[in-house]
Amino acid sequence: LGLASLSATLAFALAVPLAWWARMSHAARLVVLAVAALGLALPGPVVGLAIIELMNDPRLPVLNWLYDHTIVPPLLALVVRGLPVALLVLWFAVFSLPWQLFELAQLDGVSQWAQLRRIVLPLRWPAMTAGWLAAFALAMGDLSTSILVLPPGVETIALRLFERLHYGAEDQVAGVSLALWLGFGLIGAVAVGMLTRQARTTKPRRPAARAAT
């Protein structure tokens, strides 16, 4: 849980400025979409092998030490996997706001990044929460990427389930699977609820009908 929470937080911290930067220009939107598409398209084992190759570079002994003694490799792998999902959710959060709000803020002299802090974050926190939950759920269930880079002594829930399945511990597999099913169901329900609430607040309200004279 700790590794999944930390990776989701880092992915969220990267996704927020990227989604906000995407609205500033057409070129920025293309770059951010390319980042999201690449992250979604890359298979998990490819990401894991790329991290192994990077952190075993003999020219960078610091990376070698981090690879052998820290959780940086699996953390980096889970951030790469979770970033595209969080980015797409936050894209919706940013681009669903009325553009008039930002025009008024610019007229008042509010900078671009101050608009993110004062407008987007307070108004779009439900979608922001849904983005974090999506990255967290993906990190919780990841096996294909993290299994290649986990250091000795570190075990994720997905890896534990895989090992119990391999050794035939069916009762433990059933218990862990049920817990994961309930947990993912709760996360999905909360995320859908957050996005539904956000969509309702985004819909323009009809002007009240005038009383007949």
Question: Residue locations for each model-derived region?
Answer:
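Cytoplasmic-entry segments and transmembrane alpha-helices of multi-pass inner-membrane transporters
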Residues: 16-54, 102, 208-213
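Hydrophobic transmembrane alpha-helices
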Residues: 35-42, 75-84, 136-140, 150-151, ...
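Interhelical loop and adjacent transmembrane-helix boundary motif
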Residues: 140, 146-192, 197
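Membrane-interfacial helix termini and adjacent extracytoplasmic/periplasmic loops
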Residues: 26-32, 45-81, 113, 149-153
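C-terminal transmembrane helix and the adjacent membrane-cytosol boundary/short C-terminal tail
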Residues: 21-22, 26, 91-106, 110-118, ...
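Start (N-cap) of specific transmembrane helices in multi-pass transporter permeases
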Residues: 3, 29, 114-131, 176
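Transmembrane alpha-helix signature in integral membrane proteins
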Residues: 1-24
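Membrane-embedded alpha-helices of multi-pass transport/permease systems
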Residues: 13-18, 49, 73, 80-101, ...
